[in-house]
Curated annotation (Swiss-Prot):
PROSITE patterns: ISOCITRATE_LYASE (PS00161). It comes from Leptosphaeria maculans. Pfam families: ICL. SUPFAM superfamilies: Phosphoenolpyruvate/pyruvate domain. Signal peptide: none annotated. Catalyzes the formation of succinate and glyoxylate from isocitrate, a key step of the glyoxylate cycle, which operates as an anaplerotic route for replenishing the tricarboxylic acid cycle. Required for growth on ethanol or acetate, but dispensable when fermentable carbon sources are available. Also acts on 2-methylisocitrate. Plays an important role in plant pathogenicity. Its EC number is 4.1.3.1, 4.1.3.30. Belongs to the isocitrate lyase/PEP mutase superfamily. Isocitrate lyase family. This is Isocitrate lyase. Induction: Expression is induced by starvation and acetate. Mg(2+) binds at D168. Keywords: Glyoxylate bypass, Glyoxysome, Lyase, Magnesium, Metal-binding, Peroxisome, Tricarboxylic acid cycle. The lineage of its organism: Eukaryota, Fungi, Dikarya, Ascomycota, Pezizomycotina. Disulfide bonds: none annotated. InterPro entries: Isocitrate_lyase, Isocitrate_lyase_ph_CS, Pyrv/PenolPyrv_kinase-like_dom, Pyrv_kinase-like_dom_sf.
C-alpha cells in the first residue's frame, strides 16, 4: 500500500469513527451543518485526548438525568481554588462567571464592569486555574486514601473534586474564527461546557444592564455551529449553552434575518426625517451632550414607534372597514412567521392601504435598529437555537416564575426535550421578589419546568465580599478575638478542612513525593516534627 493509499485509509477510518460517535444518543437532538469528512480533514495527525472530554460526558449525564427526572443541578460562580474545593462537597457542577472574571481576574489585571472588554484568555485562564486545583486536590485525596489501611479508610474524606465546569464565553469575543479559538482554549483548559449569548460583541453588556444590542438569529446560530465544529475537531462532547438576551433587548444590528422582523420597530410618522440625518445635522451645527439627547427624545416621541403588525392594526382600526376585528385576525394569522416584505404585501391586499412603516428612519446614531424584546421574542429565538445547542438560557429582569413557565412552555411546545438553564441572579432583589418560603422552593419549582441546570452567577463574589467586610470590621475592633470567633472556631466546629491549611494545601502529599524520590527519608519534610498544625490534633 502506497503512502497516499494508507493516508486515505486512515482518513476513512477516522470518518467512520466520527459518524459512529455522532450516532450516539448524546447527539440525538443535535443538528450539524457540516460533514464528518470536513471535521476529520481539519484534524492533525497526532490524536490528542483532552481531560475536559471526561468532564463533558460527566456533565451531560448530570443534566440528562436531572431533566428526565424533573430535577436540577444547581451551583454558583466560583472565584478561586479554596472555593472550588469547598463547593465540591455539596454541589455537582461549578460555574465560572465572566462578570466575576472581569472584576477580579482579567488577564491584564485591570478590573472593570461586565462589558467583555477583557482579553478573551481571561475566562479560560480562570477555568484552567480551577481545573488544575480540582486535579491537584483529587490526587492529594487519592494518595491519602490509598496510603491509609482499609480498616481506617472510611474515616478519610472521599470528595468528588472533579465537578464539571461550565464557563462564560460572553459573545465569543469576535467573529467565527475567534469563537473557534476561544472554544479550543476552553476545552484545553478543562471546561465541560460553555455558554454564549446573542448580543453584539462590541456593545456586550451584563445581562442586567441597559442598552443591549442583539445580533440576528442567523448570526448567533453560526456561533453555535462554530462551537460545535471546534469541539468536534477536538473530539470532545463539550456542552454548548445558548443564552438569549432578547427579553430585555432594545436594539439589533441588522434586519437580515426574517425571523427577527416581527420584533423590529419602525417610525410610523411620515412627516419626520430619519433620526440619523437629524442627529448628524444637529452635531454639525455645534450641538452636543444633553442637547443631542433632547433632540433624539423629541424625535422618538413624535415618531410613534411601533412594530409593523401594531401599525397595521392601528390602520385598520382607524379606517372605515366593516368588520375590523375579522380583518385584524386575518392579517395576524396570514402574516405569522412572514418577513416584513411579505407582511406588507398581505396588509396592502387586505386593507388596500400601503401602511407607512420605516424601520430605517428609526435607526440610532450607531446604525442599530429599534427592537422590542420580551418573553415571546425570547421563545422565538430559543426555538431557532435549539437544534444547535444542548441547553438554552433566557436572561430575565426578575425571578418571575410565571415568565419562566411561559418561556419553558413556549420552547417545549416545539422542542419538548429541550434542556433549560436559569440564572438565579444576585442582581435580583430576592427579598422583594418573594417570601422566604418561596425562595426555598424556587429552584425545585423551576426544575419541574425543565430548568435542569441553575446557577447564581456571582455568589462567589458576594460571599467573599460579605466575609471580608464582616471579619475586617470585627478585626479592627477586637483583634485576634475576631479571628477566633468568626473564622477559626467555626471552621473547627463545622470540620472545614482548610482549618489545617498546610494539609489542605497538599503538604503531606508533597512530603510523601519527596520521600518517594529520596529513598523514604527527607530531613526537610514540611509536615515533620515542629509543624504548628499539630496544635489542632
Amino acid at each position: 500500500m502506497s503512502h497516499m493509499d494508507a493516508e486515505d485509509a486512515q482518513f476513512q477510518k477516522e470518518v467512520a469513527e466520527v459518524k459512529q460517535w455522532w450516532n450516539d444518543s448524546r447527539w440525538r437532538y443535535t443538528k450539524r451543518t457540516f460533514t464528518a469528512e470536513e471535521i476529520v480533514s481539519k484534524r492533525g495527525n497526532l490524536k490528542i485526548t483532552y481531560p475536559s472530554n471526561s468532564q463533558s460526558k460527566k456533565l451531560w449525564n448530570i443534566v440528562e438525568h436531572r431533566f428526565k427526572n424533573k430535577d436540577v443541578s444547581y451551583t454558583y460562580g466560583c472565584l478561586d481554588p479554596v472555593m472550588v474545593t469547598q463547593m465540591a462537597k455539596y454541589l455537582d457542577t461549578v460555574y465560572v462567571s465572566g462578570w466575576q472574571a472581569s472584576s477580579t481576574a482579567s488577564s491584564t489585571d485591570e478590573p472593570g464592569p461586565d462589558l467583555a472588554d477583557y482579553p478573551y484568555t481571561t475566562v479560560p485562564n480562570k477555568v484552567g486555574h480551577l481545573f488544575m486545583a480540582q486535579l491537584f486536590h483529587d490526587r492529594k485525596q487519592r494518595e491519602e486514601r490509598l496510603t491509609t489501611p482499609k480498616a481506617d479508610r472510611a474515616k478519610v474524606a472521599n470528595v468528588d473534586y472533579l465537578r464539571p465546569i461550565i464557563a462564560d464565553a460572553d459573545t465569543g469575543h469576535g467573529g467565527l474564527t475567534a469563537i473557534m479559538k476561544l472554544t479550543k482554549l476552553f476545552i484545553e483548559k478543562g471546561a465541560a461546557g460553555i455558554h454564549i449569548e446573542d448580543q453584539a460583541p462590541g456593545t456586550k453588556k451584563c445581562g442586567h444592564m441597559a442598552g443591549k444590542v442583539l445580533v440576528p438569529i442567523s448570526e448567533h446560530i453560526n456561533r453555535l455551529v462554530a462551537i460545535r465544529a471546534q469541539a468536534d475537531i477536538m473530539g470532545t462532547d463539550l456542552l454548548a449553552v445558548a443564552r438569549t438576551d432578547s427579553e430585555a433587548a432594545t436594539l439589533i444590528t441588522s434586519t437580515i434575518d426574517p425571523r427577527d422582523h416581527y420584533y423590529i420597530q419602525g417610525c410610523t410618522n411620515p412627516a419626520l426625517q430619519p433620526l440619523s440625518e437629524l442627529m448628524y445635522a444637529a452635531e454639525q451645527s455645534g450641538k452636543s451632550g444633553s442637547e443631542l439627547q433632547a433632540i433624539e427624545d423629541a424625535w422618538v416621541k413624535e415618531a410613534n414607534l411601533k412594530l409593523f403588525h401594531e401599525a397595521v392594526v392601528d390602520t385598520i382600526n382607524a379606517g372605515v372597514h366593516v368588520n375590523k376585528q375579522e380583518l385584524i385576525n386575518q392579517f395576524l394569522e396570514q402574516s405569522k412567521g412572514k418577513s416584513n416584505a411579505e407582511a406588507r404585501t398581505i396588509a396592502q391586499g387586505l386593507t388596500g392601504v400601503d401602511v407607512y412603516f420605516n424601520w430605517d428612519a428609526a435607526r440610532t446614531r450607531e446604525g442599530y435598529y429599534r427592537y422590542k424584546g420580551g418573553c415571546q421574542c425570547a421563545i422565538n429565538r430559543a426555538i431557532a437555537y435549539a437544534p444547535f445547542c444542548d441547553m438554552i438560557w433566557m436572561e430575565s429582569k426578575l425571578p418571575d416564575y410565571a415568565q419562566a413557565k411561559e418561556f419553558a412552555d413556549g420552547v417545549h411546545a416545539v422542542w419538548p426535550e429541550q434542556k433549560l438553564a436559569y440564572n438565579l441572579s444576585p442582581s435580583f432583589n430576592w427579598k422583594a421578589a418573594m417570601p422566604r418560603d418561596e425562595q426555598e422552593t424556587y429552584i425545585q419549582r423551576l426544575a419541574q419546568l425543565g430548568y435542569c441546570w441553575q446557577f447564581i452567577t456571582l455568589a462567589g463574589l458576594h460571599q467573599s465580599a460579605l466575609m471580608a467586610d464582616t471579619f475586617s470590621k470585627a478585626y479592627s475592633k477586637q483583634g485576634m478575638r475576631a479571628y477566633g470567633e468568626i473564622i477559626q472556631e467555626p471552621e473547627a466546629e463545622n470540620k472545614v478542612d482548610v482549618l489545617t491549611h498546610q494539609k489542605w494545601s497538599g503538604a503531606n502529599y508533597v512530603d510523601n513525593m519527596l520521600k518517594m524520590v529520596s529513598g523514604g527519608v527527607s530531613s526537610t519534610a514540611a509536615m515533620g516534627k515542629g509543624v504548628t498544625e499539630d496544635q489542632f490534633k
